[in-house]
């Protein structure tokens, strides 16, 4: 009922709404969160406690996850969502299968790019078989740390995703080893992750979406370059929920910009476990 309420409120104003589905953080989970080692693709060290080894998912675990993705997609469909996004980003569990730095498996889910992508493509197929909604895949194309996946290496992966039936890609950069790119600050500059779009455009024919410190001006430039089809804002809508209405009514000067301090949004949720706010509103 709560999901339906959100969807109906969104549709009431003529907007579309997408449901993001995730199977969790994997090795990025806090070790004390569940009282046992986190799951991952392999027995890699926990991000926040390297002395603790993760528990590799069994094939039975993987089958259960596929069923849960399908069931979640059905819930999203019944609630009225217009699309589904798979969270394969930021070094979370799906990414831990896709990336050789974390995936050390020797079965059909490890080794070659095709095998490492099997977990992700089976998720896509599970959702596609369950519902007739567009499927978006969120992926960081450049991990930005020495052992991580590079932009060039990611091109084969997005080609595999397109062949698997993904309808659009939500792309940027970073992972928890480069957490400054997960919550990009002002120091990283405007549109700090749009550079991944140009190369991706050469390898896929599906729509490309991009986020990361965008301003209205940088968003327009990226769209006009044709390297991306959609530009996304997150924290900007916390700073000024009326951003789009102001832009559409030619009142750009009235937009309250996000200053990317992370103090009252990310800081409240991650650091203080309280409801988010915005320093721009204080």
Describe the residue ranges of each PLM region.
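Flavin-dependent oxidoreductase catalytic cores
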Residues: 1-282
């Amino acid at each position: 009922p709560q999901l339906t309420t959100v969807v109906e409120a969104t549709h009431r104003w003529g907007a579309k709404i997408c449901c993001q589905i995730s199977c969790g953080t994997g090795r990025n989970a806090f070790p004390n969160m569940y009282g046992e080692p986190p799951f991952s693709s392999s027995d890699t060290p926990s991000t926040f406690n390297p002395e603790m080894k993760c528990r590799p998912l069994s094939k039975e675990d993987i089958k259960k996850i596929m069923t849960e993705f399908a069931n979640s997609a059905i819930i999203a469909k019944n609630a009225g969502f217009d699309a589904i996004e798979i969270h394969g980003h930021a070094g979370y569990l799906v990414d831990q299968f896709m990336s050789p730095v974390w995936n050390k498996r020797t079965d059909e889910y490890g080794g070659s790019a095709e095998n490492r992508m099997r977990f992700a493509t089976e998720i896509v197929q599970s959702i596609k078989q369950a519902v007739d909604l567009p499927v978006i895949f969120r992926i960081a194309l450049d991990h930005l740390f020495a052992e991580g996946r590079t932009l060039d290496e990611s091109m084969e992966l997005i080609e595999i995703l397109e062949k698997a039936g993904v309808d659009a890609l939500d792309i940027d950069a970073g992972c928890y080893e480069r957490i400054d790119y997960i919550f990009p600050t002002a120091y990283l500059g405007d549109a700090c992750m749009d550079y991944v779009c140009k190369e991706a455009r050469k390898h896929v024919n599906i729509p490309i979406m991009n986020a990361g410190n965008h301003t209205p001006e940088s968003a327009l430039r990226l769209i006009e370059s044709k390297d991306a089809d959609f530009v996304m804002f997150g924290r900007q809508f916390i700073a000024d929920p009326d951003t789009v209405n102001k832009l559409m009514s030619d009142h750009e000067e009235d937009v309250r910009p996000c200053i990317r301090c992370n103090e009252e949004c990310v800081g409240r949720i991650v650091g203080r476990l309280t409801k988010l706010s915005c320093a721009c509103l204080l």
